[in-house]
């Protein structure tokens, strides 16, 4: 493998130091079936000189074995790792690939295009900053293009590059490119993207992927890789300090630290913080890491914080700025992606996990589900596998969160089946719900005892605990 940096051959330690300090961009690729997502990632890796010689030899061998292309080798096989993917020529699982340029590091998630793998795509999109949505130049904007764009919008991705692929198949026709560009812009007006860019490419031939295309001199913009290198996503990240405690570290009587990853914002030694839900305040005494103590820590860093005062803090509690607190309520509105065969039912109790805080809760109403192909809102009594819906949730105790649109790290949650411990859904919190206090229904002693027996002997019914109101 060759690299664009000469440091790797002359000074490996300096190369690693420079590499560590590069900005990280998480990228999602999605589009209709056979639009060329895996081939595009393979082309990025190949033209960036990020492929080992033994990998190339293996790909040439597999290309002949699976007959996936008429060329000597199929770049898509760099990404399609599952046996069933290679045999069918499609992507099923979310495949992650890593590469670096002089400007930044990349993690690329190659997600499946088929509707039955919507949950896989949602999983890949949940951590990405930017999406590359591929459109086949021969077919234009398809139903799956709309579905993937909607899911990206729902999951908070603000930056989108529309890569109009297979331009070689239409003789690099500018009019077709402009027509597709206009059609997508009209469709995307209702979505929450803040930055949409277009680039005509041929992943198979390499046009406008890493190198400029001599076949499309009419295109004045940048190549795909240049767009990836220059897009700025810093302004999308919340500046509010959020630190959720994952573990209380007490190795001896003289040390009590609170371990976790900073979700957003930054913290310095001496800063005043408030603990939630107790609302007690203290100051940061030290910021401890494996490599030693720090004066300052920022979003994404895993650290241990110690405080000047002895405050009762447990796993799931949150440290924030006293003047900048999140919502803390037990009822909220959320969009949910359902991920299992057994549907989401109203009033069935689940384990709800917001960050490291675990509570029990249920959907007390499904406001609507969304047809991901037409974006039409439909009434629903339940959510089936791969469906997306808007629900009202009630949990047993207040949880601390920000709206997902403003802070993805604290505005997301997962839904867990209490019996199997399987993650059955993923949610994005949109708004808190203020519940007007009303006189609680008075249950008889017999009803409470019967409810307790049902929950004990028939837990799979998912009955609520009526003794808690």
From Swiss-Prot:
Location of region: G3: 110-113
UniProt entry keywords in alphabetical sequence: ATP-binding, GTP-binding, Nucleotide-binding, Nucleotidyltransferase, Transferase
Source taxon at top rank: Bacteria
GO molecular function annotation: ATP binding; GTP binding; GTPase activity; guanosine tetraphosphate binding; sulfate adenylyltransferase (ATP) activity
Residues covered by the tr-type G domain: 22-236
Region (G5): 202-204
Chain segments carrying region G1: 31-38
Region described as G4: spans on this chain: 165-168
Keyword hit for Nucleotide-binding: yes
Catalytic activity: sulfate + ATP + H(+) = adenosine 5'-phosphosulfate + diphosphate
Keyword Membrane part of the UniProt annotation: no
EC number: 2.7.7.4
GO biological process: hydrogen sulfide biosynthetic process; sulfate assimilation
Region described as G2: 89-93
Residues that, per the record, bind GTP: 31-38, 110-114, 165-168
The protein's annotated pathway: Sulfur metabolism; hydrogen sulfide biosynthesis; sulfite from sulfate: step 1/3
A Pfam family of this chain: GTP-eEF1A_C
Subunit description: Heterodimer composed of CysD, the smaller subunit, and CysN.
Similarity comment: family membership: Belongs to the TRAFAC class translation factor GTPase superfamily. Classic translation factor GTPase family. CysN/NodQ subfamily.
Biological role: With CysD forms the ATP sulfurylase (ATPS) that catalyzes the adenylation of sulfate producing adenosine 5'-phosphosulfate (APS) and diphosphate, the first enzymatic step in sulfur assimilation pathway. APS synthesis involves the formation of a high-energy phosphoric-sulfuric acid anhydride bond driven by GTP hydrolysis by CysN coupled to ATP hydrolysis by CysD.
Name listed for the protein in its UniProt record: Sulfate adenylyltransferase subunit 1
């Amino acid at each position: 493998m060759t690299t664009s940096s000469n440091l790797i051959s002359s000074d490996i330690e300096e190369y690693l130091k420079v590499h560590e300090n590069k900005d990280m961009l998480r990228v999602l690729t999605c589009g209709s079936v056979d639009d060329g997502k895996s081939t595009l990632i393979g082309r990025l890796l190949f033209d960036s000189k990020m492929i080992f010689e033994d990998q190339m030899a293996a790909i040439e061998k597999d290309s002949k074995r699976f007959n996936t292309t008429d060329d000597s080798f199929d770049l898509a096989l760099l990404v399609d790792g599952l046996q069933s993917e290679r045999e069918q020529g499609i992507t099923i699982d979310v495949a992650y690939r890593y590469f670096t340029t002089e400007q930044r590091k990349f993690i690329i998630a190659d997600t499946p295009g088929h509707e039955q793998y919507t949950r896989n795509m949602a999983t890949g999109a949940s951590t990405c900053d930017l999406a590359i949505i591929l459109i086949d130049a021969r077919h234009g904007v398809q139903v799956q293009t709309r579905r993937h764009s909607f899911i990206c919008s729902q999951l908070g991705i603000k930056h989108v590059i529309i890569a109009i692929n297979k331009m070689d198949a239409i003789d690099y026709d500018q009019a077709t490119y402009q027509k597709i560009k206009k059609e997508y812009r009209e469709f995307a007006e209702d979505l929450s993207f803040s930055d949409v860019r277009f680039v005509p490419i041929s992943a198979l031939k390499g046009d406008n992927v890493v190198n400029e295309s001599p076949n499309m001199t009419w295109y004045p913009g940048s190549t795909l890789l240049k767009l990836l290198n220059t897009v700025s996503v810093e302004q999308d990240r919340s500046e509010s300090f959020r630190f959720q405690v994952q573990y209380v570290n007490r190795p001896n009587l003289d040390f009590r630290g609170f371990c976790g990853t900073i979700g957003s914002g930054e913290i310095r030694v001496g800063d005043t913080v408030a603990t939630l839900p107790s609302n007690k305040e203290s100051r940061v005494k030290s910021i401890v890491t494996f490599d030693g103590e720090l004066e300052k820590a920022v979003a994404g860093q895993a650290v241990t914080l110690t405080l000047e005062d002895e405050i009762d803090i447990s796993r799931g509690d949150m440290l924030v700025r006293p003047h900048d607190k999140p919502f803390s309520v037990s009822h909220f509105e959320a969009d949910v992606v359902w991920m299992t065969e057994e549907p989401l039912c109203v009033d069935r109790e689940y384990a709800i996990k917001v960050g490291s805080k675990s509570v029990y809760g249920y959907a007390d109403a499904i406001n609507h589900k969304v047809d991901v192909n037409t974006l039409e809102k439909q009434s629903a009594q339940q959510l089936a596998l791969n469906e997306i819906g808007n629900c009202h949730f009630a949990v047993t105790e207040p949880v601390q969160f920000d709206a997902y649109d403003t802070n993805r790290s604290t505005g997301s949650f997962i839904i867990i089946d209490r019996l199997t411990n399987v993650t059955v859904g993923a949610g994005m919190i949109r708004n808190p719900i203020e519940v007007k206090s009303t006189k609680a229904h008075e249950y008889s002693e017999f009803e409470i005892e019967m409810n307790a027996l049902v929950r004990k002997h028939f837990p799979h019914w998912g009955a609520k605990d009526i003794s808690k109101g």
